[in-house]
């Protein structure tokens, strides 16, 4: 996955020429060295990773804005596989582990708690998260709402999304980012395939020797 990440980010830098943002649960030294040349924003999943690479970011020849992924402890995702806030989750830093010294040098906060959901879920997430992380949000330049926003779905409440963005932007004076990955290509085409062969194999019970 790390190798694919670097290829993707290089494509974003060289082909689109716009801002490149990256997040990973962890970075290897080899890949992080490449990311320093490719990315404008780097989000860390833990303070341990941030501390490991902080000096390299500060010594970089180009300006790189870094943030930390938080775990707000609130999500309405029904399938545990896609729920980053289930007990024992390692995705993001929970409130009780936020640290003054460790936060030094970070510009933003990232959270990703949604999966194919409408903006009412985002609104309730903010209701839960903003009061708890208010102290840290006041120190941020940007906030990333993560993905899972089904913006292009016919019943998606865009006006509510706008209110959510303006609420955070105006309260904390930050730039707001979203990552609606699936929504960009939702119902955008068809997958066409041809069946070339059918192979039906009946496997009998193995012979057991006593």
Language-model features: locations:
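Short conserved active-site loop signatures built around small residues
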Residues: 68
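Active-site loop/helix belt of alpha/beta enzymes
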Residues: 56, 61, 72-199
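N-terminal active-site wall of soluble small-molecule enzyme domains
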Residues: 1-4, 8-40, 47-53
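Hydrophobic residues within beta-strands of alpha/beta enzymes
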Residues: 1-4, 20, 42, 109, ...
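FAD-binding glycine-rich core of flavoenzymes that anchor FAD
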Residues: 46-60, 65
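Short beta-strand/loop segments at the ligand-binding rim of alpha/beta enzyme cores
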Residues: 15-21, 63-65, 175-176
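Single conserved hydrophobic/aromatic residue that forms the stacking wall/gate
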Residues: 2-3, 7, 201-210
């Amino acid at each position: 996955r790390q190798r694919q990440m670097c290829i993707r980010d290089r494509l974003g830098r060289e082909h689109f020429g716009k801002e490149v943002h990256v997040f990973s649960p962890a970075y290897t030294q080899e890949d992080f060295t490449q990311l320093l040349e490719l990315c404008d924003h780097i989000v860390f999943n833990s303070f341990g990773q941030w501390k490991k690479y902080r000096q390299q970011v500060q010594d970089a020849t180009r300006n790189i804005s870094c943030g930390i992924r938080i775990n707000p402890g609130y999500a309405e995702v029904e399938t545990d596989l896609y729920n980053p806030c289930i007990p024992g989750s390692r995705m993001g830093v929970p409130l009780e582990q936020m640290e003054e010294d460790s936060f030094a040098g970070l510009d933003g906060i990232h959270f990703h708690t949604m999966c194919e959901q409408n903006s009412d879920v985002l609104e309730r997430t903010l209701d839960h998260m903003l009061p708890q992380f208010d102290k840290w949000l006041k120190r941020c330049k940007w906030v990333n709402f993560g993905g899972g926003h089904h913006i292009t779905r016919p019943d998606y409440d865009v006006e509510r999304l706008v209110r959510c963005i303006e609420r955070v932007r105006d309260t904390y004076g930050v730039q707001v980012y979203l990552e609606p990955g699936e929504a960009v290509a939702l119902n955008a085409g068809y997958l066409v395939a041809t069946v070339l062969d059918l192979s039906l194999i009946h496997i009998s019970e193995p012979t057991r020797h006593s």
